[in-house]
Amino acid sequence: MSRTVFCHYQQSDAEGLDFVPYPGELGQRIFAQIGKNAWQAWLAHQTMLINENRLSPRDPKHRAFLEAELQKFLFERNADKPEGYVAPVGD
């Protein structure tokens, strides 16, 4: 049986995540306040950020940048796309 949460990103009830997706207090907040669809939207946005900015998840500075963007994307709704980003045809 799935959990329902009030998704902060969607501002509506949504199916909750099955597990805590991120370590620490932020992970607990995501688990409690973010739905599956919003998390999938973040993963797509994160992939775009990694590719467009040539980020390495191993680099501590890049990880800090991604964490800040995660918070902006899910909780502030003001994450930006990289400068010069052009969406693929069909998006």
UniProtKB/Swiss-Prot annotation:
GO biological process, one term: cellular response to oxidative stress
InterPro entries: Fe_traffick_prot_YggX, Fe_traffick_prot_YggX_sf
PANTHER family: FE(2+)-TRAFFICKING PROTEIN-RELATED
GO cellular component, one term: cytosol
Lineage of source species: Bacteria, Pseudomonadati, Pseudomonadota, Gammaproteobacteria, Lysobacterales
UniProt KW keywords: Iron
Stored Gene3D superfamilies: Fe(II) trafficking protein YggX (1.10.3880.10)
NCBIfam families: PRK05408.1
Superkingdom in the source lineage: Bacteria
Keyword Iron assigned: yes
Annotated disulfide bonds: none
Similarity comment: family membership: Belongs to the Fe(2+)-trafficking protein family.
Protein name (Swiss-Prot/TrEMBL): Probable Fe(2+)-trafficking protein
GO MF entries: iron ion binding
Described purpose of this protein according to its UniProt entry: Could be a mediator in iron transactions between iron acquisition and iron-requiring processes, such as synthesis and/or repair of Fe-S clusters in biosynthetic enzymes.
Keyword Chaperone (UniProt): no
